[in-house]
Amino acid sequence: MTAPGFVDFPDSPFHLYQPYPPAGDQPAAIEGLAQGMRDGLMYQTLLGVTGSGKTYTMANIIARLGRPALVLAPNKTLAAQLYAEMREFFPKNAVEYFVSYYDYYQPEAYVPTRDLFIEKDSSINEHIEQMRLSATKSLLERRDTVIVGTVSCIYGIGNPGDYHAMVLILRAGDRISRREVLARLVAMQYTRNDADFARGTFRVRGETLDIFPAESPELALRLTLFDDEIESLELFDPLTGRVRQKVPRFTVYPGSHYVTPRDTVLRAIETIKEELRDRLKLLTAEGKLVEAQRLEQRTRFDLEMLQELGFCKGIENYSRHLSGAAPGEPPPTLIDYLPADALMFIDESHVTMGQLGGMYRGDRARKETLVQYGFRLPSALDNRPLRLEEFEARMRQCVFVSATPAAYEQEHSDNVVEQVVRPTGLVDPQVEVRPARTQVDDLLGEIKLRVAAQERVLVTTLTKRMAEDLTDFLAEHGVRVRYLHSDIDTVERVEIIRDLRLGTFDVLVGINLLREGLDIPEVSLVAILDADKEGFLRSERSLIQTIGRAARNLNGHAILYADAITASMRRAMDETERRRTKQLAFNAEHGITARGVNKAVRELIDGIVAPARHDTLESAIAPEVLADEKSVAREIRRLEKLMTDHARNLEFEQAAAARDALNALKQRVLLDGAA
């Protein structure tokens, strides 16, 4: 086996880190899909089984073709997993993350039956907002960019032309007045704050301007002026103030995707007034006087805000006026920032394509009510996600990636490439059917065998009630078990899966949450209860996906508890057996001995997963922190800043954790002093 190292390809800006050379079906899949791209094929499908290294195949195709890429995943958890893997394969290139930046989002809505208007309410995750801004910056600046995203990318963001026009380019030696720089920064939605220097703010001290770029995770820019000339540009650490490097040139990107030049705002105000006049005439003619008064009051307030500040709350509802688009035209989205020759990969496409098709209809139904009852102008209907046909019109050359392609991929694909043989030699799990009458007792016996071998178990049920009852039953019998359900937020889900891998507990019970892409090599048994209840949770695709969760383990085994074999079960078992036969034949022909996957448990996204818990907070204090008084004082200041930052972002659990760590450190210092 070749040693791990970086691989470069001709005319490609990517430096691919290869921990191992492609193996199994990977070389043929990489060559087949890359050749299809070169031949101009629009749609291709990678039919890759669980654990066959589909992400590695995607990375190899991107590196060989040397074109920017967008990789879409069906949810934030899988996007985070893909992002972490892509960063490992391309550590020297721009790998970016573009998902919804809302931790919590309540869209504005009106319920006519109760005359209830619900105001828009949301909580934005600052870390993800910074990553979104970084993603568009990379697309505009460099070719070696891989964006990992979710369906969030079909929702409207600012027009690429306006966004690019607002960029501020600073060069050492250029002539520009301090007043002009400040005016440009305010127009780019940066705020002046001399006390609290955070992302998207700037501060002024005499002839020195400090700017904290909105897309920068850790470095800020210091601009020193001499009269009206830029004397120097320096990147520095905002916490310590230490200068990291001098730069001859720096580009400051807008503080938001929704920035708009002043003349565009003034033009939009006139067209909004025009639309308001027409709409008020119509509502009055129909005798809807309450709706007319409501619409006029709300819109006039927004117009005043736009006139004075250049933006208003809910500015996205006027996006059609701001972009100058015609009624019914699709909004600008992340797809518009992609170069024409970009590549697209749609991971778990059997789920993601359905999502892309469904987003528009739900959004439209809610907004039509708001327009009908005078809460919004009709142009608000054009602030929407793309329809499926609009997304298709904007698609670049695309590879659908799935172990179970749906009808859409089968109809559209010009080329289907199978990736069934795994590089590790692992084969699909053995599938066994057992009677459902005694499923719970039988499962308990199987769990005890797996726990004794230090292996993990996934159990999938049909209903929430059954999942809860089963969790209680297993816990009463001494099994370390957790229950994963839809009420658990993204971050906690990632933590639960990590704890399962680390052995904090042994059995995870869920309903529809243990399927696509979950990468848990420690799981050796997947138990599917009531497998004969035909429906979307027990369809052929669902069963194949769930069985696949045990395919990363050497002793992988799947048990279907059923009293009859349904058509879906039969097809799923036949497909698993077909793949298993092909894998065993390949191993025998090449003399391969299957080996288990030893994958390090890592954090998916820096700063998103909470730190590891300790039995006592005192035990969590690193010895070097207590080395001397300076170190202790530095750590206390760090924790205090962390606590206030979290509290400001309404991240109260993290703020409480920082407070507890701070109290524990102070307690430890007091005890040591007393001793």
Curated annotation (Swiss-Prot):
Q: Where in the cell is it found?
A: Cytoplasm
Q: Where's the motif Beta-hairpin?
A: 101-124
The cross-references to Gene3D superfamilies, in alphabetical order and at most eight, read:
6.10.140.240, P-loop containing nucleotide triphosphate hydrolases, UVR domain
Any idea where the Helicase ATP-binding domain is?
35-192
Q: Which GO terms describe its molecular function?
A: ATP binding; ATP hydrolysis activity; DNA binding; excinuclease ABC activity; helicase activity
Q: Which PROSITE patterns match?
A: HELICASE_ATP_BIND_1, HELICASE_CTER, UVR
Q: InterPro entries annotated for this entry?
A: Helicase/UvrB_N, Helicase_ATP-bd, Helicase_C-like, P-loop_NTPase, UVR_dom, UVR_dom_sf, UvrB, UvrB_inter
What keywords would UniProt list here?
Answer: ATP-binding, Cytoplasm, DNA damage, DNA excision, DNA repair, Excision nuclease, Helicase, Hydrolase, Nucleotide-binding, SOS response
- The chain positions of domain Helicase C-terminal read 439-605
Q: What is its main location?
A: cytoplasm
Q: Which SMART domains match?
A: DEXDc (SM00487), HELICc (SM00490)
User: Record's superkingdom?
Assistant: Bacteria
- Report whether RNA-binding shows up as a keyword of the record: no
| GO CC annotation, single | excinuclease repair complex
User: What Gene Ontology terms for biological process does this UniProt record contain?
Assistant: nucleotide-excision repair; SOS response
Positions contributing to ATP binding: G48, V49, T50, G51, S52, G53, K54, T55
Q: Give every UVR domain span.
A: 633-668
The reply to whether RNA-binding figures as a keyword in the UniProt entry is: no
Summarize subunit and interaction data from the UniProt record for this chain: Forms a heterotetramer with UvrA during the search for lesions. Interacts with UvrC in an incision complex.
Task: Give the family, as the similarity comment puts it.
Answer: Belongs to the UvrB family.
Q: Report the NCBIfam families cross-referenced here.
A: PRK05298.1, uvrb
The entry's free-text remark on domains says: The beta-hairpin motif is involved in DNA binding.
Q: What does this protein do?
A: The UvrABC repair system catalyzes the recognition and processing of DNA lesions. A damage recognition complex composed of 2 UvrA and 2 UvrB subunits scans DNA for abnormalities. Upon binding of the UvrA(2)B(2) complex to a putative damaged site, the DNA wraps around one UvrB monomer. DNA wrap is dependent on ATP binding by UvrB and probably causes local melting of the DNA helix, facilitating insertion of UvrB beta-hairpin between the DNA strands. Then UvrB probes one DNA strand for the presence of a lesion.
Q: What is this protein called?
A: UvrABC system protein B
Q: Native species of this protein?
A: Bordetella petrii (strain ATCC BAA-461 / DSM 12804 / CCUG 43448)
Its lineage opens with: Bacteria, Pseudomonadati, Pseudomonadota, Betaproteobacteria, Burkholderiales
| Recorded name of the encoding gene | uvrB
